[in-house]
Amino acid sequence: MNTKIKRWFFKTCPKSGRIVGINKKNVVLKICFPLFGLAALIWFLIRVVPKPSRIDYPCQQIAAPIAFSFVAFISSTLVGFGTWKRFKLLWHSRRFYMGLSVLAVGILLSGTLYIMSVDNSLMGQVIRKQIDNGTDMGRFVPVDAPNTPMGVARGIHPGRVAWAYDPKAAAWDGKRGLYSDPDNNSQTRVDDMMEGVIIALTRQNTIDKAWDELFRTFNYKKGKGAVKYKKGEKIAIKINLNDNGGTNIIDATPQSVYSLLHQLVDIMKIPQNCITVYDAQRRGISAVYDYVQPVYPNVNYQNWGGFVPDVIRYSSEITDAGARSLARAAYEADYMINMALMKRHSEPTDKWRDSAGQAAITATGKNQFGSIGNVPPLHLSIRDWSSFRGMGTYNCIVDLMAHERIGGNTLVYLVDAMYVNPKHNGKAVRFQLPPFNNGWTSSFLASNDQVAIESVVLDFIYSELPLCANADNFLHEAANIGNPPSGIAYIGKEQGSLGVHEHWNNPTHRMYSRNLGTGKGIELYRVPLDEKRPAIEYFYADENALHYKTSHAEEVRLNGKRLEDAEGVIPLSISKTTDFNLETLANGKVTSSQRVVVRRLENIEICQAKDMERQGSASLNEDGSVEFKGEKGSSEGSVSWKVNIPHKGEYYLVVSYAGGNPVPSYLYINGEKRSENIGYLATFGGKRGEFVFPVALAKGTNELRLEHPGRRSNRIYTVNIAKEIK
């Protein structure tokens, strides 16, 4: 098609030249819209009604939104005309209130329909969602036989997926406390698993050499030469969050994030301020933050700075501007570490609703939805179970896997499989098959091949839980991106293959083609771990004491001093911030160690919530606390106050709160936004919690403001400014 004619009729992508919609600025097209709309509707009915799967054809991706926009336009006109006619009748009958009510409802309905007629993409989404509502998600049965690999394996050792399992790492009984509590997970056992998979992935003999190998190989492939990490280079760690902590909805395990930071900061000596831990679609990171921040205070937690527009291009269907934006942490990173969960995203149902979920699984692929500015426009393309899709159809996850700033910038793929999530917002389930034997999965996986690790995660979940139909469609597309079953010309097609996909031989032996020596597919390598090795089962501090428990140790030391008991409670009597290091020893050598930092703070100023200036949805309760009582998307509120600081320097903001609505707030200091993550965990029975956040304050008067956008919050009692006692 002639370029000028194409641009006259259509809206095109400025980079690829692809048609992405109608040119709404064209005056002639605006005038002739009813004719074009009617033609599009007729074309849609003729083509799609006899064969619904045709809705995914490129021509229908353009025609359908125009057709339904036309329907919305006509409906808007008719509703508007009918409303006005009814209003005049009531007004002349002197039924003023009834007439005004009819007019208001009519304007609202007509306006909504008009907006949908103008926004083709919105109309398309609504129609497709309504078509899927109430339909059967089907059940997944692989179309490819076991051990028939497709695609080209990637990695230092192609196709290798390292797997570590230690049943004692996840020690939660499923009832007491939270899965994320420090006494429910062994930090040192998690450390051993994390170290084991990284070493096994590279076949090095020490963890520092293993990370060096990862950095050198990555940089060589990026054209930088086989060089190590250089001080100042930025690392983005994308974790998976759906909750804000304080509940048993499974998110990134705090102990897992701690272990990764321990390797990067303590072993590889990477500056803390060069690391960002984030999920840009979930502002709350409190459970992870509360556990990790005292030891690694200078890491950037969720301060990702918003999104960079027009970074991502999609190969089909998706044109939304927000969906094309990328989290700044990912955009600016020299290295991405994709740290996902082992999660079934949707529980298959024969009557689908949006709350059931969109895709079959969430692992390293869908994890990156948390790096995208606007996610809902992506949902249609990942419903591979839909009657309008199926195997051999476009899936936007493939575009993210191939993107130079996302999959193309990933140093290593990790899967935190301490607890498996049966649904996108679900609680942990136990696995029945050996070696789990009705226990938690309590595992870690690592790979340089994203398709391979996704395939392994899918096989693990499918062996225990049913999945919705066509669960591995995106893996078939990714493995064959150069010539995919869908025929889509993916933007990353020049890569040929994004990795290797296959299914294991059976859920008992879990053997892939490289394990069997029958092909060049996946190798699942299990890291050998002795459950009876010396370990610290837990080590944590509360306000008054240190709590610890060790196992299989010949000797236990705290800050170099021998302890007589393998477990115990040690009263705290300290006046300043203190580091505590617990070690287990065997044959005179340290076998495991864990560090805990206990802060001591001195209050500089105390501000009662009742004395703060309140705006919007901020309400004062009878007990003197302030609570934001707006609904999602409907209101905003804030509290502000002033503090007088004696000296310029580093301080801590200490928020005392209570309640079961753990939604974080924005923090502004002297008009400048400092954080979008003043977070709160859920508390119960009136128990109060504290959130501690480091802030830099100027000498003299500083104005602080907590802003809460549009959702209910916990109750805030006091906000103190404190100085650390060192």
Predicted regions and their residues:
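Internal/C-terminal transmembrane anchor helices
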Residues: S93-M116
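Extracytoplasmic
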Residues: L601-K726
